[in-house]
Amino acid sequence: MSAFNLERFRFDKGKKIDTEFGEKGASSRPSTPNSQLEDHVTSIPETPEAKRVNNPSLFKKDKGVSFLDSDSENEDHQSKSKFSSTHQQSHPREENGTSDSVTDDSEDDYLAVKRPSASTAQVKDGSKYKNLQRLKEIFPKQNNDELLKLIESTSTLDGAVAAGVVLFNKEGSSRKRKLDEVPKDSSPVHEGINGQTKKKKKIDRVSSDNDSSLSEDDWEKQEASVKKLQRHFPDLDKEELREVLQEHDWSFHEALEALKLFAEDETDALQNAAKKEVSNGKEFSRSNKNDNKSSAKAKANQNSNKAMAQNGVKKKGKGKKYSENAKRDTRDLESEESASDAGSCLDEDYSSGDEKLEEEYKTKILSFLQDASLDELYLIPHCSHKKAQKITELRPFSSWESLFEKMTKSNGLSEDLIWDCQTLIKEREVVMKLMNKCEEISRTLTKQVTQLTEDGECGWNIEQPSIMSENLVLKPYQKIGLNWLALLHKHKVNMILADEMGLGKTVQAIAFLAHLYVTGDSGPHLVVVPASTMDNWIREFNQWCPSMNILLYYGSQEERKHLRYDILNKVVEFNVIVTTYNCAISSAEDRSLFRRLKLNFAVFDEGHMLKNMSAIRYQHLMTLNARSRLLLTGTPVQNNLLELMSLLNFVMPHMFSSSTSEIKRLFSSKAKSTDEQTIFEKERIAHAKQIMKPFILRRVKSEVLKQLPPKQDKIKFCQMSKKQEQLYSDLLNKLKKSIDATEKNSELCNVMMHLRKMANHPLLHRQYYTADRLRTMSKLMLKEPTHCDANPDLIFEDMEVMTDFELHRLCNEFTTLSQYKLEKELILDSGKFNILEKLLSDIKKKGDRVVLFSQFTMMLDIIEVFLRHHQHRYVRLDGKTQISERIHLIDEFNTDMDIFIFLLSTKAGGLGINLTSANIVILHDIDCNPYNDKQAEDRCHRVGQTKEVKVIKLIGKGTIEESMLKISQQKLRLEQDMTTNDTGDEGTIPLDMATLLKTSLGL
């Protein structure tokens, strides 16, 4: 089918006219200057005969060889890219405008049409006239001039017919419009310039026509038809296929029919042309027999289209829906055409395959629509919940005909949904193939571990690398992790170490880099970490592996510039580069460094930061030039399965990248969440577990750390104070009215945030500082030396957007406003503070210490006032704390037992820090993502903890926080499903691999 390439009928955009002449005519006659050539080709039909320029021919008339002027010649240039110049057919220019071979009156009429045009070659024999008449029968609406151009631009009648199908549509020839736009006086030099813009003009014209008359949905459907057609004819240009579809009123099957009807004959013609060797100026031609055959074929095409229209091909809507009879007729014709093409594959349209495959997929579609759940039906492209519900109401579908009839006759449904099922089925097949690949990898790894265990090879047991500190020893489960990493690396498989937080993933990664070092791979390696854990990584490297050279890539832009120079010019020696996510991708120079630097191994700490494959961070880090990758994350499954698939795609892009779109659709959380887990959801979880099995190792603390103290979770529902409850109710009613007016998702997010703030503390809104009070305060601010020249109206505008607590701090800062400070009772007026006061008092009596988290830094500001009021000693760390100061604050809290409370913001203090000196975790306000809270609470519940850990969550009773808690529990259930083995006990992933490794190591 690739030989059927209509590109050769288009204008040549690249070649120069004088190059053509130089190759063919230089030896016969000197070439004419450009000025003369320009005069020759710019004679227009309206020029009188007496004044017409009549230059001599540029070349000698070699036998059987002729040359056309600029218009015709451009048609031939494209063809020359496909065939030898000796295989092309043109006709010699007759200077007097007549041909000796023409004798009858009808031929004279034909010449009368062509004689005025300087761009038309003359008729040499009667065969051209016969071809013209045949084309006239096939394209009765086109004039002789257009049809003759087709004959001259192709070597066969079949080619002319095929070109005509593409170029002529029912509303007029777009090709003719295109030619009319070219100035008549364009010279060969100008022609080359104009030719470069012709395709763009054509695209713009088609786009503008469609945009003005079609809706966005119709345009998308038309684009889908073009793509489907291009899969059958990959060598054809999209715009040419679009014209074929326009010719057939955007009927995909009719357009496919028309193109396939001529493809076979055109292929034969091209093959025959390639076999014939034309030399010494002998003219290549087709026999009349073949011409008759192709003409009959073209007529058959017209007749078949008419017959289809008469036999029940009904166009519905905008020409995209057909009756079942039409589908059957179309498939019969396609089956005849594809009988000779045994290698044709099933593509977007199942009816284009052979009969067995077609019936097989019909059966799959019928079975799917009959048995699929609502969630599965909802995954069909363009299928809404309402349509899915209608499909279930139409069941049962006893046969294909019954399905087709019910779908086409039901309001709101169409046959498009039937054929869109193929997309979903195809995506499922892609995921199944991916699962089979993963299963094969898993079997290979399991087989090797089993074999090594049975053989008892001592060399398999990878001990703690010799360059690691002798004073520190890996724990047994950490040694298993090291061996697992080494095994997968040996098989060139990247991995995700997903041990539960607190099991020492950092140490296992350092041990693996040390193992690479002692086995001959000294780097360079890269470790990318969050800013909050960078100091901890440097400390762990120095403690566990002091002999490795660690380079910290961090600092200002100027400092990183010098570091880049040293790295690229090998001024500094290093084995491992440690940097942050921000420094690795913040500028083009940073990204360029890690693309140019050939890294042997890259480690990404807190890998769940790469859970969104559409994020800029994800896409930039994918370009790192690393041979192997390792992700460390304590929460591989957070909101949905798609995030897990994103992690797998990041570590194994060569395996997953080709299936990204299928993975996105099948594992996206399009279906609505329900309390009961559907069969479909269970199947998706099973599929995800099978895919992730070879690449992820996860152990939980309850299994591997028998000596680790238990952790208790407790939820405290806090009744709001009376004033707070009234304010919350007023805010809720106000927001309900605004939601009814807008109903936008962005507004809903704002509503949720406003309610969360009010549930935590009333001072996070502006309630007490009225507009009148702010007017007075803005004028008083003019008495301050820093604001004496300020505009009070601008000060008022700034104050309007501030919260009550911010305005209270402003009053503390400026003495002129001190009279407007809030009373301490208002600051302490919070339902959660009432619970917290008693809670902290009891904890302090027992001698325990507290780590308190909040989502809002302003809430931490208010909590500081509360702690000072009750004389509790504390330290604080949030996103504004300098990176260099964070490690000192952590050390201070862990060593000074008089510090009772460590205040942290959940995002800044919830990652990668060790606070085992405390055993009580209080979450003042929960996160929408429960895994952020889990990360936070595991700052205490980790290796090194000796006391029982209690996690207390404060939930505002009767507030939006209760709904957030319910959603969080559903998300946590997904993780439990993913980390549960086949027997139902929570365990490792994959269980069998870790068990085998444990056995092989004798642990």
Swiss-Prot record:
Its recorded reaction(s) are: ATP + H2O = ADP + phosphate + H(+)
Instruction: State where composition is biased (Basic and acidic residues).
Output: 172-188, 221-235, 274-294, 321-333
Q: Gene3D superfamilies, alphabetically?
A: P-loop containing nucleotide triphosphate hydrolases (3.40.50.300), Tandem AAA-ATPase domain (3.40.50.10810)
The yes or no answer to whether the keyword tRNA-binding is present is no
All copies of the CUE domain together span 221-264
Which is one Gene Ontology cellular component term of this protein?
Answer: site of double-strand break
Query: From which organism does this entry originate?
Result: Xenopus tropicalis
Q: What is this protein called?
A: SWI/SNF-related matrix-associated actin-dependent regulator of chromatin subfamily A containing DEAD/H box 1
| EC numbers, comma separated | 3.6.4.12
Give the location in the cell.
Nucleus; Chromosome
Keywords recorded for this protein, A-Z: ATP-binding, Chromatin regulator, Chromosome, DNA damage, DNA repair, DNA-binding, Helicase, Hydrolase, Nucleotide-binding, Nucleus
In chain numbering, where does the motif DEGH box fall?
Answer: 605-608
Please describe what this protein does: DNA helicase that possesses intrinsic ATP-dependent nucleosome-remodeling activity and is both required for DNA repair and heterochromatin organization. Promotes DNA end resection of double-strand breaks (DSBs) following DNA damage: probably acts by weakening histone DNA interactions in nucleosomes flanking DSBs. Required for the restoration of heterochromatin organization after replication.
Q: Where is this region: Disordered?
A: 15-130, 172-235, 274-351
| Limits of the Helicase ATP-binding domain | 486-654
Where do the Helicase C-terminal domain residues begin and end?
Answer: 835-997
SUPFAM superfamilies reported in the protein's UniProt record: P-loop containing nucleoside triphosphate hydrolases, UBA-like
Q: Which residues are listed for ATP binding in this entry?
A: D499, E500, M501, G502, L503, G504, K505, T506
PROSITE patterns for this protein: CUE (PS51140), HELICASE_ATP_BIND_1 (PS51192), HELICASE_CTER (PS51194)
